[in-house]
């Protein structure tokens, strides 16, 4: 063991040996939020912790061009964990990594770095940012090792076995995540058939973003052991509820919830109201990151409990931002538009940047809306000055490009690649011939 190793690295090497780990996965995410990894034998752990592991960034979506592709994975010691579902003698552990370039400089296209940078901006203002996402997902049957959209069960909201036949899958996911350090608060069947939700305790935004990636990775891996496909696709089936990732956010200052004011209107502080005002002002641009695919916009339509109108409320779940009833240290704002296809690092960074802009510029939100917005006609919405979220990926990207605050938050590299991905996805979708078109036109014409 090298004498130059830090005390933390030395402790981890002893832990890896004690855990009898044979392989280590060095994980990171691309701009789209897809988890990537390099697997190394445990004997390479010392090198990984002290020097990092080089890889080819040109092969990763949105990372680097081939002529400047050498990149370094630096494991974050705080993210060490065994993968509980990998049983047997060949135990596997993982680290989540930061991505660097030559000279140990942070790579500006690393989503984790984008969030770290934004959290540092908040810290300069005295704030820490906590988030608590609620991830919904579907469990579908597999056929010939390929995922289908055939339901595993016919359960509904809060149903139990035998109607909820995927209870065992959720149980094993909960047990695995608990072993990985999650504090699980609840698990249940969701509204749609074969749709589920597992909730874990909120935490600082970086830890929570790491956990979102881990949650999806673990859920998919364990579902596969049951011969099922877990999908976090926003709208896999038309005509039923899609999957969301409602995200609760709050700021703390000097260890106290900065959103709570017992003497404020609705017991909300000016900080809370400014944060909400900032989120509302930047909502259209945030949508490009929080709803990152063509499919995402098929969820953001009226009638399926997904927000599509830019408004806020204390109780109203048809609003984009809802302030739950709890006060004191639990005071928070729930941002309801994100879906679980999003990159959590970029989404949390944009939420925070928008909120901080609201605080800096004292952006007061409009009056809260306590009416079911889905039941209002366009004239009534116009009178209340309630605008709509973008209706497509291309539209939301156009709003992002006009939003100086969020473009500065994400950085040129990320914005340019999000735009490139938008154009590529939009063209691909536009040129494809869809089953709907065949059903509609083939026999008639």
Where are these regions (language model features)?
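Glycine-rich, acidic/polar active-site loops that bind/position phosphate-bearing ligands
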Residues: 2-445
């Amino acid at each position: 063991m090298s004498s130059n190793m830090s005390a933390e690295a030395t402790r981890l090497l002893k832990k890896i040996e004690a855990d009898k780990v044979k392989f280590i996965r060095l994980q990171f995410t691309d701009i789209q939020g897809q988890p990537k990894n390099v697997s190394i034998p445990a004997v390479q752990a010392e090198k990984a912790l002290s020097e990092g592991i080089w890889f080819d960034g040109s092969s990763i979506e949105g990372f680097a061009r081939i002529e400047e592709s050498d990149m370094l994975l630096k494991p974050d010691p705080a993210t060490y964990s065994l993968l509980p579902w990998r049983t047997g003698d060949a135990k596997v552990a993982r680290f989540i990594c930061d991505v660097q370039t030559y000279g140990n400089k942070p790579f500006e296209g690393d989503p984790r770095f984008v969030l770290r940078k934004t959290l540092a901006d908040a810290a300069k203002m005295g704030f820490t940012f906590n988030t608590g996402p609620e991830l919904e997902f579907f469990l579908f049957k597999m056929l010939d090792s390929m995922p289908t959209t055939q339901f595993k069960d016919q359960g509904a909201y809060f149903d139990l076995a035998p109607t909820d036949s995927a209870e065992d899958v959720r149980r094993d996911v909960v047990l695995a995540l608990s072993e990985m350090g999650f504090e699980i608060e609840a698990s249940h069947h969701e509204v749609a058939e074969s749709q589920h939700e597992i909730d874990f305790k909120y935490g600082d935004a970086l830890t929570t973003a790491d956990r979102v990636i881990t949650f999806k990775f673990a859920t998919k891996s364990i579902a596969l052991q049951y011969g099922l496909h877990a999908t976090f696709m926003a709208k896999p089936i038309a005509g039923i509820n899609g999957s969301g990732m409602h995200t609760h956010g709050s700021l703390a200052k000097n260890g106290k919830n900065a959103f709570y004011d017992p003497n404020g209107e609705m017991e909300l502080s000016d900080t809370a109201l400014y944060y909400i005002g900032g989120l509302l002002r930047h909502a259209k641009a945030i949508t490009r990151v929080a709803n990152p695919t063509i499919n995402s916009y098929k969820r953001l339509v009226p009638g399926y409990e997904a927000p599509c109108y830019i408004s806020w409320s204390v109780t109203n779940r048809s609003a984009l931002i809802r302030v739950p009833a709890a006060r004191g240290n639990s005071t928070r704002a729930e941002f309801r538009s994100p879906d679980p296809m999003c990159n959590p690092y970029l989404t949390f960074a944009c939420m925070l940047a928008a909120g901080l802009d609201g605080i800096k510029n004292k952006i007061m939100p409009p009056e809260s809306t306590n009416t079911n917005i889905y039941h209002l006609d366009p004239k009534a919405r116009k009178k209340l000055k309630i605008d709509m979220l973008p209706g497509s990926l291309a539209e939301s990207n156009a709003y992002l490009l006009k939003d100086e605050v969020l473009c500065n938050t994400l950085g040129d590299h990320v914005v340019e690649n999000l735009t490139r991905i938008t154009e590529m996805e939009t063209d691909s979708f536009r040129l494809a011939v869809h089953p709907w078109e065949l059903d509609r036109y083939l026999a008639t014409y």
